[in-house]
Amino acid sequence: MLDRRTKIVCTLGPAVASKEGILGLVNAGMNVARLNMSHGEHADHEANYRWVREATDESGKAVGVLADLQGPKIRLGRFINGEEMWAEGETVRITVEDVEGTHDRVSTTYKNLAQDAKPGDRLLIDDGKVAVVCREVDRNDVVCEVTEGGPVSNNKGVSLPGMDISVPALSEKDIADLRFALNLGVDMIALSFVRSPADVDKVHEIMDEEGRRVPVIAKLEKPEAVDALESIVLAFDAIMIARGDLGVEVPLEQVPLFQKRAIQIARENAKPVIVATQMLDSMISNLRPTRAEASDVANAVLDGADAVMLSGETSVGIDPQNVVRTMSKIVTNAEEGGKVPPLTHVPRTKRGVVSYSARDIAERLNAKAIVAFTTSGDTAKRVARLHSSLPLLAFTPHPAVRSQLALTWGAETFLSSEVKSTDDMMEAIDQSLLGMDKYKEGDMIVVIAGTPPGISGNTNMIQVHQLGQTLREQ
């Protein structure tokens, strides 16, 4: 059984590039494996995907696979000398022309920069380490004054906070990566630099062309996403609070409260939420986290996040398994000693009301568990957002849904056969749970499901059930 309720997402990379390395992460507590399409070749991701599936089969644990698209990342071009030092007060030019970069003039991958920029706009380079301000636009060049100096080098990222940029939601690379990931068989897709709810439409269009739809996660890292938060949550299947780029694009001091607000809105809408970036960053090169990092992880848990994510800590860190074990300890301790704020919104949908009622009945009867029998995963997510202290057991006949629920708070998943009636459903639950040490005949559980079974989004039934009752009646 899962003692830890909050899930852990681990980024794969050179530090774990083997079946043994990935199996080590699974055994340490990884729930979702992240394929970061910003790095590595398709062959690397294909190998990692295969090793995750092999490790899942060997361990018997359900692990989801998430493909994270790079998005339309804007970068500087290359410098003749590789690196230059820009000092405060200097004038530099960033051009849309394809030139070899010098101290005074360098190109950018964003070919509409001169069209979109206007005097007063800020450009942040290398995650904000260097800052410049547009003073004028001279044909193909944006003439800038350096306001915060530092080194600039080949292909460094450029952030354009507040600038109304005209880039598509998906680059050509993203489209190729998306098609590759769908054909590979990943369980979820994350879309970077989401600015509006309409950004999901192009992803769905390509999914339909490939004949396969999977959940799409909106990565919140742009000011436009902050402003359109509620509509983005409704349009996408889940959200990721990508605090690295977000903290560059919006004032850093606003990020913590935005995190709390985003988690609350996602929970109200039964959408899983991941908190990401620099959670245990020092453990890339150290065996212990800082006290501030431990507090950050615990705070995300107490905010109500479904999952916390590791990036470089597991992809290139010195001891990825130790990082996962450390995060698991921090999470478990926070869950044991803290309390997530209860949801205060009043559900108005049938599925919402039924999920609240199932939780209330189970807790008042001191049931052994809440069991969600689900076709799409929605029933389990609606119960999970309530953060009951009771175990949440999710049964589904679909392997893909089982893997997708690896991201959902508290959900322990079981693969069942297709059922045609409520009696079939109870029998499948009895057979699975009575084969486990934790449950015995006569234990009371509360089952939430849709009837007739097999219809997605039809949650309409609560049944108080004693384990073994169905088997005794045969």
What are these model-predicted stretches?
Residues M1-Q474:
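Non-catalytic helical/linker scaffolds that mediate oligomerization, partner binding
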